[in-house]
A protein has these predicted regions:
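Short, small-residue-biased leader/transition segments that mark boundaries at the very start
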Residues: 3-8
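Conserved, mostly hydrophobic/aromatic
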Residues: 35, 92, 248, 348, ...
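Catalytic cores of alpha/beta
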Residues: 26-38, 372-384
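Gly-rich Lys/Arg/Thr-decorated short loops/hinges at beta-loop-alpha junctions or inter-strand turns
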Residues: 1, 14, 223-228, 306, ...
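Flexible, glycine-rich loop/tail regions that form catalytic "lids" or insertion modules at the edges
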Residues: 32, 44-47, 57-284, 293-306
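Flexible glycine/proline-rich, aromatic-decorated loop/lid segments
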Residues: 2, 30, 34-64, 71-72, ...
Length: 413
């Protein structure tokens, strides 16, 4: 499909022809976005549409006709595609088509240079031979009924998940018992899991051995460099939010409040978050909130959902959260993707200046996300006067991130 797009483009007839993809592999909005971004004029996901039709007939929980169900599926794909486009500031399909606004992870340079010529890649991976062998295996498999693949929800014997039921059970056991052996068993499960993320592929040479014991002063100095990613009260429960703050304060590190404010009763105690975040919605940002900080953090983007704003569903906005965010209970709270008072480096410099005027001794960090070219953005942020630049990776997420972003958006570093 990609080669056909390149062929007609190189011949100068791309604008005179349409590419319609008929595929049984397209399932969700990410699949659709990939096809459009690599040149498809239209996509017909025939297998997904047929599956939706069958579900509407067999399901006892819906009164939708097959046509209505298929139309709902089409609308969901369109809405998801618009969401993906909006992350990059694009509002029309014609501007997104052929843009190749993706990053390749897991394919070698030979494939990228031949097929995804204008797409960024920073890793090596599998090649044509591996893909060809896989296709041969799939072609030889006879028709069998396949179960749910386990891509989103963990299934035994299916795709590996970082937070598997086994891992969660061991964590719960360690927390409830307070036994260090149980905690050690939980950590061992994490460290010896199957390779799921790129960092799981990194290993230290066997010749390197660390037998040196650190004294308490050296450990304290190391712990001061540790921070916990900012996650808001609402995305996390009050108990989890306070536990993270207290744990980091006890070892001398820092935790982030996230967007949404913090209970004033925690200020000046061991439950206070040292890093206070200022995000696009400005929820919970008050003079007292800022005065309790040891570091200000301006959130320009979030690692697990770059280009998206925050959204806290109304059912999560109880009386306590509504009070902290100075809003109404039960109302969905939406933070826009951009800061509406920041449209240039000069605007960012003004906010940094205002924060430093409020507390000259408090460093200001700016949170960006990992992406190709982030270095250029970081230079501008440094020129704006930021003391610290935080680069959030793709797994810097919370319960407030949608599935499509968790699975497909952001880079590991």
């Amino acid at each position: 499909r990609r080669q056909r797009q390149m062929c007609i483009r190189d011949r100068g007839i791309r604008l005179k022809a349409s590419l319609v993809v008929v595929s049984g592999e397209v399932r969700d909005s990410h699949d659709l976005a990939c096809h459009i971004a690599y040149g498809a004029s239209a996509v017909w996901p025939y297998l997904a549409l047929e599956r939706v039709r069958q579900l509407s007939i067999s399901s006892k929980d819906t009164n939708l006709t097959p046509e209505e169900a298929q139309e709902n599926y089409r609308k969901a794909l369109d809405k998801g595609l618009l969401k993906i486009m909006s992350k990059m500031g694009i509002c029309t399909i014609s501007s997104y088509r052929g843009s190749e606004l993706f990053e390749v992870i897991g394919l070698n340079r030979d494939i990228v240079d031949n097929i995804f010529k204008f797409t960024k890649t920073r890793t090596e991976g599998v090649g044509f031979k591996f893909l060809n062998d896989k296709l041969k295996i799939y072609g030889d498999i006879e028709d069998v009924e396949s179960g749910v693949g386990g891509f989103y929800k963990h299934k035994k014997g299916a795709e590996t998940h970082v937070t598997s039921p086994k891992t969660v059970l061991k964590l719960q056991k360690a927390v409830r018992s307070g036994d260090f052996d149980d905690w050690d068993e939980y950590m061992s499960t994490l460290e010896n899991r199957d390779d799921v993320q790129l960092r799981d592929l990194f290993t230290l040479p066997a010749s390197i051995k660390h037998n040196r014991e650190f004294n308490e002063d050296e450990l304290k100095e190391i712990f001061q460099k540790f921070t916990v990613s900012s996650m808001s009260l609402g995305a996390l429960s009050e108990e989890a939010h306070q536990a993270l703050a207290q744990a980091m304060n006890e070892i001398g590190g820092k935790s982030g409040s996230g967007e949404g404010g913090e209970d004033p009763a925690r200020y000046g105690t061991e439950r206070n978050s040292k890093i206070k975040q200022i995000a696009s919605g400005r929820f919970g940002v008050t003079p007292d909130y800022l005065a309790s900080a040891e570091e200000f953090q301006i959130k320009m983007a979030q690692g697990s959902k770059p280009g998206e704003g925050g959204q806290l569903p109304g059912f999560k906005v109880d009386s306590h959260i509504a009070k902290l965010r100075h809003t109404v209970e039960g109302v969905t709270l939406i933070s826009p993707p951009p800061h509406h008072d920041i449209y240039s480096i000069e605007d960012l410099a003004q906010l940094i200046y205002d924060l430093k005027t409020f507390n000259p001794d408090c460093p200001v960090s700016v949170k960006l996300v990992s992406e190709p070219g982030v270095g250029t953005i970081a230079v501008g942020v440094a020129k704006a006067g930021a003391d610290i630049i935080t680069i959030a990776g793709s797994d810097g997420g919370t319960g407030a991130s949608p599935w499509v972003s968790i699975k497909h958006a952001g880079s590991p570093w």
